[in-house]
Swiss-Prot record:
This is Chlorocatechol 1,2-dioxygenase. Gene3D superfamilies: Aromatic compound dioxygenase. Binds 1 Fe(3+) ion per subunit. One of its GO terms (biological process) is catabolic process. It catalyses: 3-chlorocatechol + O2 = (2E,4Z)-2-chloromuconate + 2 H(+); 3,4-dichlorocatechol + O2 = (2Z,4Z)-2,3-dichloromuconate + 2 H(+); 3,5-dichlorocatechol + O2 = (2E,4E)-2,4-dichloromuconate + 2 H(+); 3,6-dichlorocatechol + O2 = (2E,4E)-2,5-dichloromuconate + H(+). Belongs to the intradiol ring-cleavage dioxygenase family. Pathway: Xenobiotic degradation. Its cofactor is Fe(3+). It comes from Pseudomonas sp. (strain P51).
């Protein structure tokens, strides 16, 4: 027997049973719910629904315990093996979206420069798709690895990402709409910062005033992840300093 599994699973079962009783759920409604769960599995949207409703809670718990930068959900579109880039992510030749410069420094939780830290950067195409996932877009586009220099500094150029909808024709989208919500995520950029001996930092940053920033369907937007509008030389700028914490030994 696994005591932790017993503890968490029992609490979940108790909470569901309490809700069924308090809401006086009918047998017809119960059967509809069972059917919905079967459709969710058939549509391969279990992870989508869990991300939309619960992932932000897990991230908030992690944020309370970290000494580093605020984490955020990874999402389903991270791919290992992105190319190391020098200066810019690869984008469509006809990408007319506003240029974006992302720059800053990576430091350890004791304030030292995190020289050689590797930063995975990935974001949507101008039409809200992800390379390597949608429409056979080559995996080396709109994603790449940036290596911090001896002072922990990094910089990369790309273009502005776009808001997009999570799958909205399947069970998850149907449920969100029945609840009076929507299926839109605001434009954002994902980051995963890694360095030997340190805990990986997975996070994402948003744009002040952007569509859906105040009503993200996945509830992933925290105030300190929203970047103010700043432009230089015709490009929008995100100044982001990351703090990574030393990996903790598990006894």
């Amino acid at each position: 027997m696994n005591e932790r599994v017993k503890q968490v699973a029992s609490a979940l079962v108790d909470a569901i049973q309490k809700t069924l009783t308090e809401q006086r759920v009918t047998e017809e409604e119960w059967r509809a719910g069972v059917g919905y769960m079967m459709k969710l599995a058939e549509a391969k949207e279990v992870a989508v629904l869990l991300d939309a409703f619960f992932n932000h809670t897990i991230v908030d718990l992690k944020a309370q315990a970290t000494r580093g930068s605020r984490p955020a959900m990874q999402g389903p579109y991270f791919l290992e093996g992105a190319p190391v880039v020098a200066g810019a992510l690869k984008t469509y030749e006809d990408d007319s979206h506003h240029p974006l410069v992302i720059r800053g420094a990576v430091r350890t939780d004791d304030g030292a420069p995190a020289a050689g830290a590797v930063i995975d950067v990935w974001h949507s195409t101008p039409d809200g798709k992800y390379s390597g996932i949608h429409d056979q877009i080559p995996t080396d586009m709109y994603r790449g690895k940036v290596v911090a220099d001896a002072q922990g500094k990094y910089a990369v150029r790309t273009t502005m990402p776009a808001p997009y909808q999570i799958p909205n024709k399947g069970p998850t989208g149907v449920l969100l709409e029945m609840m009076g919500s929507h299926t839109w995520r605001p434009a954002h950029v994902h980051f995963k910062v890694r360095k030997d001996g340190f805990a990986p930092l997975t996070t994402q940053y948003y744009f002040e005033g952007g569509d859906w920033v105040d009503s993200d369907c996945c509830k992933g937007v925290a105030p300190d992840l929203v970047m103010p509008t700043k432009t230089e030389g015709g490009a929008q700028v995100m100044d982001i300093d990351f703090v990574i914490e030393r990996a903790r030994e598990h006894v």
